[in-house]
């Protein structure tokens, strides 16, 4: 009788735990959507933000947010039991209003590379497949560790890199950003790592004074020629391209950006047989 009771109680607890998981999740940022899928929450998502295009299944979901704002009325009509948000990218007032309706909000605001596996583990507590979240977090950590070890061994700190966003105006990133941290991970030096703001606007003259030895841009290789033309004749250095979505979104695919950048920087490092 006792054994039967314990079995019944165990089953009840398991059912209660499963029932407590959110069933109707809304993501308000592309990187949050990617994080949710990586954490095994894809089947729990009911709506996403604009530009949530990865994985491909995300494009089939209703969009309730964009750069223009959050569709508060539609979100409330969908009756979510969890919202994944982004402090820097989502307007705060509608988020406060959603919180007033007692809708739980999880903020995914990675500031460092280590924050990404931490966020995946946080999402594991809401996922029907927590083991998938843990596996994604572990894989990310291990590969970042490998790249860090390789970068330290390259002795490439003398390779000065300019991370370029746009041309007119011209923006870059400081060490406070994930993009700059990737450059450091690869053993190189971001020439504007010391900027007091994360995304400084810089002038052509400021870049030239700091004498970069390579430029990193987000986009496809067909952009290289226009970037080289922009800097000629004062600056003629290699231009490295990286998939823009990988590089700009603070999600699991940032690891792919790191692999791509580290590989290309290694080829340019002093002592490399590929260095020119």
Curated annotation (Swiss-Prot):
It is found in: Periplasm. InterPro entries: ABC_transptr_periplasmic_BD, ABC_transptr_vit_B12-bd, Vit_B12_bind_prot, Vitamin_B12-ABC_binding. GO terms for biological process: cobalamin transport. Residues 1-20 form the signal peptide. Residues 24-273 form the Fe/B12 periplasmic-binding domain. Its main location: periplasm. It holds the Pfam family Peripla_BP_2. Keywords: Disulfide bond, Periplasm, Signal, Transport. Disulfide bonds join 186-262. GO terms for molecular function: cobalamin binding. GO terms for cellular component: periplasmic space. The record marks 73, 205 as: Important for BtuC binding. Part of the ABC transporter complex BtuCDF involved in vitamin B12 import. Binds vitamin B12 and delivers it to the periplasmic surface of BtuC. The complex is composed of two ATP-binding proteins (BtuD), two transmembrane proteins (BtuC) and a solute-binding protein (BtuF). PANTHER family: VITAMIN B12-BINDING PROTEIN. Belongs to the BtuF family. This is Vitamin B12-binding protein. The lineage of its organism: Bacteria, Pseudomonadati, Pseudomonadota, Gammaproteobacteria, Enterobacterales. The gene is btuF.
